[in-house]
Amino acid sequence: MQHLNISESLTLNNIKSQVDEMVNKKLLTEKEKEVVNIEMLHDFFLTDIGKRMKASNYVKRESSFVIKKNAQEIMPSLDMDDIILFQGIIDCYFYEDDEVVILDYKTDEIIGGNPESAKNEYRTQILSYREAVEKITGKTVRACYLYLFDIGQAVEIS
């Protein structure tokens, strides 16, 4: 997803050609190419969140960040004066109107097709991304989503 040119028409053939070009440019290895599911990528861009991302005039992918947090926010038993550096890489965020939408992709198997376990598992991570993006951009985060490739569904995290 990081190197996919989303300004192009993302047909199955176009995505396949782009992935082949990523191998030629050494952005992907042949082994990595083998696990790319072209159909899943294509289907993602047919979803509401995929269309919103594609329509945005500003899309940032694989954005790294470091933020300071009071240690007690993470673990109440720690000293109030302790500071923890929290770092991560946000899969994607994009502007929509004058706000930001955060999108994190997950390829995990969703047991029973129920996204609730994924929402619970990743809520803290996504809310940390929200804090980081608001500090980085100075904009309000409108919404945060997980896109679960296993079931082809976006779920909102609040």
Description of each model-found segment:
Residues 1-158:
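Structural signature of nuclease core domains in nucleic-acid processing machines
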